[in-house]
């Protein structure tokens, strides 16, 4: 269910440019998006899992705040992230 080291490193390399650039906003948004999609799949199988649903809502809120920050500071990077991750806004 959780991200493996390899998948996490792949996401970091794709959005950060190098494996050391983990603090970049795009990397954080991509990692949150991957965890959100994993949790969504889990909740489809286990609809009564309220604790996981609460965690999912927290992750969505964190991703939303990072997207808002990116939109206010770098609109072009924001649009690129939306296109790369197939997020709607």
Curated annotation (Swiss-Prot):
The organism's place on the tree of life at top rank: Bacteria
Family matches, as Pfam families: Ribosomal_S15
Any one GO molecular function term: rRNA binding
Gene Ontology cellular component terms for the protein in this record: cytosolic small ribosomal subunit
HAMAP family, A to Z: Ribosomal_uS15_B
Family: Belongs to the universal ribosomal protein uS15 family.
Protein name, per record: Small ribosomal subunit protein uS15
Species whose genome carries this gene: Prosthecochloris aestuarii (strain DSM 271 / SK 413)
Lineage of producing organism: Bacteria, Pseudomonadati, Chlorobiota, Chlorobiia, Chlorobiales
